[in-house]
A protein has these predicted regions:
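N-terminal cap/leader regions of alpha/beta-hydrolase-fold enzymes
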Residues: 1-280
Length: 280
């Protein structure tokens, strides 16, 4: 697995609210489970950003999808305990921010760089594609075959690091009923998009540092021209990479885009996942 695509993959705002779900071992993986207030309309498996399944941001998002859409939501530890610690965000902010003094430049920033590398390099080694892809695919197959969940429609919601895998799941018949990917990274154009065969919704900003706006327009055009699969690509004005998960609540524009992208995902799953149990 290559290095994170841009600085925005490792920066953002970390929420402090307390998630309300539970943690269980499901199909061999520790999993955060968000249970809806009513009978579930379907099941959504979240594939998180680079900071993994334990962050408040991802867990609170799982709670919202569950409560607002009546979905059972699974957020598994696909990284097997190797996600960079949330403090990596602060390290990246410090490295990229202005230096208030010469001492910061010549002493502290080199230390922060070493600390950052000590978190990022092990993640890259332990979460290369050959390791995590089978883990992700096997989990979805297990959900499909589990008598407790086989009757539910299955959606995949991937963010940043996880967006790529959601899109790849949508390239396989029978893996998921539909997918939603927010600001995906490490995508190949056009092949990753040409292979999609399940309903796919994409949310991305027009100032995303991973997929530039020219490439976004190419993706829009390619998917709009395909009549063999349901898809949508929504471009959010002024939204940065990571906005759907790590938007700073003090930034009105980023927060608005995050809320709208969540609504987008719920509308998509409402069309293609809710009540679709047993349809592979």
């Amino acid at each position: 697995m290559a290095a994170p695509s841009c600085k925005n993959c490792l920066t953002g705002y970390m929420k402090t609210e307390k998630p309300t779900g539970t943690v269980s071992t499901i199909h061999g993986l520790e999993t955060y489970v968000a249970t809806p207030p009513n009978a579930p309309q379907g099941l959504i498996v979240m594939i998180p950003d680079i900071f993994g399944w334990e962050t408040n941001n991802s867990r609170l998002l799982a709670d919202s999808l569950s409560q607002d859409g009546d979905y059972l939501v699974y957020l598994p530890d696909f990284m097997n305990g190797t996600a960079p610690p949330p403090g990596t965000m602060e390290l990246m902010d410090s490295l990229l921010g202005p230096s208030p003094s010469l001492a910061t430049t010549i002493f502290y920033k080199p230390i922060w760089a070493v600390q950052f590398a000590s978190a990022a390099i092990p993640f890259m080694a332990r979460n290369r594609d050959a390791v995590v892809r089978p883990r992700i695919y096997d989990f979805h197959r297990a959900v499909r075959s589990d008598a407790a969940t086989a009757h539910l429609g299955l959606g995949s919601a991937g963010y940043c690091w996880g967006g790529k895998y959601t899109i790849h799941l949508c390239q396989e018949e029978g893996m998921v009923d539909a997918g939603f990917a927010a600001h995906p990274s490490k995508m190949a154009f056009p092949e990753d998009w040409e292979k999609v065969c399940r309903p796919l919704s994409v949310a991305i900003g027009d100032v995303d540092m991973v997929i530039g706006i020219e490439d976004v327009r190419k993706i829009e055009g390619l998917m709009a021209g395909r009549k063999d699969v349901e898809s949508e690509v929504r471009v959010y004005e002024g939204a940065k990479h990571g906005f759907a998960v790590r938007a700073d609540p003090r930034d009105e524009g980023q927060t608005r885009s995050a809320v709208e992208s969540q609504r987008q995902s719920l509308e998509w799953f409402g069309r293609f996942v809710a009540g679709k149990g047993g349809k592979k």
